């Protein structure tokens, strides 16, 4: 089973799990996808939406606890990525500098100086980008507090926003009938972003 199929059936397969374990599972996935480079393939959007559906369907799950943990996991994950880029990535590039690397760093610094705040916020909604943008921001030495504020806003808009969309899809009658269409939107968006990124790289 593919990761996208697993995410799409998250509410069905993991609903029997005890609430505490479900919290830990969702928070762990969010942190890994946003903070650990090797976990860029995790389908965070679909997981968040499905977690909201599960929270609405279970009486023993607290949506406030769920979204608070998701916010913290997303926020801390991006902070880890930023610090990794700044403390490890930048020194490594400076140690192994070349004209090509210097040009890349200069371009990254110029981009983050002009568009960094919005890039960090918007990257949350694009698979892969939300994993790699924070460490690149660190490498480019984006001002810490500027990154901090963008990270917080992005964590709320993405982590809390998508989870609550799933939650209300299952609790509001007018939206419930469209819950699968909304879930499909997030899954298709994830697939399209991967396809576009790969096509641009070739």
Model regions and ranges:
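Membrane-interfacial helix-loop-helix
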Residues: 1-28, 53-146, 171-186, 193-202
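Transmembrane alpha-helix interface/packing and boundary motifs in multi-pass membrane proteins
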Residues: 27-48, 123
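Membrane-helix interface "capping/anchor" motifs
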Residues: 35-44, 142-145, 149, 201
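Short hydrophobic/aromatic, small-residue-rich stretches within specific transmembrane helices
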Residues: 67, 151-152
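Hydrophobic alpha-helical transmembrane bundles that constitute the permease/transmembrane domains
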Residues: 128-132, 152, 156-159
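Transmembrane alpha-helical segments of integral membrane proteins
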Residues: 157-168
């Amino acid at each position: 089973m593919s990761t996208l199929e697993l995410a799409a059936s998250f509410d069905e397969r993991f609903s029997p799990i005890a609430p505490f374990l479900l919290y830990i599972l969702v928070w762990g996935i969010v942190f890994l996808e946003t903070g650990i480079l090797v976990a860029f393939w995790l389908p965070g959007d679909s997981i968040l939406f499905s977690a909201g559906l599960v929270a609405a369907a279970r009486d023993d799950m607290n949506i406030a606890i769920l979204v608070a943990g998701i916010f913290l996991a997303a926020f801390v994950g991006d902070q880890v990525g930023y610090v990794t880029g700044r403390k490890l990535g930048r020194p490594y590039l400076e140690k192994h500098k070349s004209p090509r690397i210097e040009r890349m760093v200069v371009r990254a610094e110029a981009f983050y100086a002009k568009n960094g705040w919005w890039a960090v916020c918007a990257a949350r909604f694009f698979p892969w980008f939300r994993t790699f943008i924070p460490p690149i921001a660190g490498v480019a030495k984006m001002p810490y507090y500027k990154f901090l504020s963008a990270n917080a806003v992005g964590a709320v808009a993405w982590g809390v926003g998508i989870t609550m969309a799933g939650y209300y899809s299952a609790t509001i009658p007018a939206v419930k009938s469209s819950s699968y269409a909304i879930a499909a939107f997030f899954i298709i968006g994830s697939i399209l972003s991967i396809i576009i990124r790969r096509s641009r790289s070739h």
